[in-house]
Every structure is written in structure tokens, then in C-alpha cells.
């Protein structure tokens, strides 16, 4: 199998991002987004996915973190899509349920090329680590649509916003590990392609 990795550099008036991803890594990360909580969450996701992720971002944080987090998700989704290549042999579907202290979160993904997000964040507090909870909905939406994946995140219960999001990122990492595992011959689709 060819190496499943990709890299992108993207500069706009709002952000300057460079991102390298190796799907078949060891969970090693070098992340500096300027948003400490995001660094923590992306490190957790990468560890549980087994991704090697090198990410640098300089964003317009003097405004807020919205552009930074949304653009990181767009670039991560694009790099993930490129690194997956033709998707031959992958399981395609992955899922995980993760407890984090009082919180329980389930994530289910389908790397079918059909982008969709199901994300009910009513349980999340309005502010998490200094950011409005809506910024995380935009993060996951941008990731799902740019990666071409169906992403369901279910916050089953919990009180602490940090714990709920940490559970989501860990579960997403485990779901990626499962979905990207190569265990089949050909493409995981009765129609013969994933696009």
C-alpha cells in the first residue's frame, strides 16, 4: 500500500496554516494553533487515531478563535481526503463511545464521500475554554464537509464542557482508526466506488 499522507499550506487574510498528516503514523503530534484548548483536542484525536499530525496556524485571534478553528478544520478535512487516496481496502465506517469522567460521547463516521453532520450540542455549556460552543459545531461541520464524511456526534450525558468535547475528540480519533483500517480487498461499497 502506498503511503497515506498529505500536506497543505493555506494562507488567507484570516489565517496562515501549514498541515502535514500521516494516517498510518504513531500518534505523534507537533501542534501550535494559538488556541491551547484546540491544540489539546487535536493532540487527543491524533493519538487515538494513530495519526502523525504536524500543524501550525497563525490566525486573527485578536478578533476571536472562529476563523482559526474553522480554517484548521477545512485544511484538516482536505488533507485527510487527499491522504485517503482511492480508499481501497478501508473499513469506511468507524464508531466509538468514550467516557470522560461524568460525560459519555458517541461518534460514528462513514468515509463514503457523502458529507453530512449530525451534532446536537444543547447539552454543552454556552462557553467552553473561553469559546462559544457554536465554534465547535462549525469546526466539525467544516471537517465533515471538506473530508467528504458523514459525521454523527452524540453527547449522551455530562456536565463539564471540556469533558464532553474531550470525549468527542477521543471518540473521533478511535472512529478514524477503525474506519481507515485496511482490512478488505477493493472498495467498501456495493456500487464499486466511494465518491
Curated annotation (Swiss-Prot):
Pathway: Amino-acid biosynthesis; L-histidine biosynthesis; L-histidine from 5-phospho-alpha-D-ribose 1-diphosphate: step 6/9. It comes from Maridesulfovibrio salexigens (strain ATCC 14822 / DSM 2638 / NCIMB 8403 / VKM B-1763) (Desulfovibrio salexigens). It is an enzyme of class 4 (lyase). This is Imidazoleglycerol-phosphate dehydratase. Keywords: Amino-acid biosynthesis, Cytoplasm, Histidine biosynthesis, Lyase. One of its GO terms (molecular function) is imidazoleglycerol-phosphate dehydratase activity. Its EC number is 4.2.1.19. It catalyses: D-erythro-1-(imidazol-4-yl)glycerol 3-phosphate = 3-(imidazol-4-yl)-2-oxopropyl phosphate + H2O. InterPro entries: IGPD_sf (IPR038494), ImidazoleglycerolP_deHydtase (IPR000807), ImidazoleglycerP_deHydtase_CS (IPR020565), Ribosomal_Su5_D2-typ_SF (IPR020568).
Amino acid at each position: 500500500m502506498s503511503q497515506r499522507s498529505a500536506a497543505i499550506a493555506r494562507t488567507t487574510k484570516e489565517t496562515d496554516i501549514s498541515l502535514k498528516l500521516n494516517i498510518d503514523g504513531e500518534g505523534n503530534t507537533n501542534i501550535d494553533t494559538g488556541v491551547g484548548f484546540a491544540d489539546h483536542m487535536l493532540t487527543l484525536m491524533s493519538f487515538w487515531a494513530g495519526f502523525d499530525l504536524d500543524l501550525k496556524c497563525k490566525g486573527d485571534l485578536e478578533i476571536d478563535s472562529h476563523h482559526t478553528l474553522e480554517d484548521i478544520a477545512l485544511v484538516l478535512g482536505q488533507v485527510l481526503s487527499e491522504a485517503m487516496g482511492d480508499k481501497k481496502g478501508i473499513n469506511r465506517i468507524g464508531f466509538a463511545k468514550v467516557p470522560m469522567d461524568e460525560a459519555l460521547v458517541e461518534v460514528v463516521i462513514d468515509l463514503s464521500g457523502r458529507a453530512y453532520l449530525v451534532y446536537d450540542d444543547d447539552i454543552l455549556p454556552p462557553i467552553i475554554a473561553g469559546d462559544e460552543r457554536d465554534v465547535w459545531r462549525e469546526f466539525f461541520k467544516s471537517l465533515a464537509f471538506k473530508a467528504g464524511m458523514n459525521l454523527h456526534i452524540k453527547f449522551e450525558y455530562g456536565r463539564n464542557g471540556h469533558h464532553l468535547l474531550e470525549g468527542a475528540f477521543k471518540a473521533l480519533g478511535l472512529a478514524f482508526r477503525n474506519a481507515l483500517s485496511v482490512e478488505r480487498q477493493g472498495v467498501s461499497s456495493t456500487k464499486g466506488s466511494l465518491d
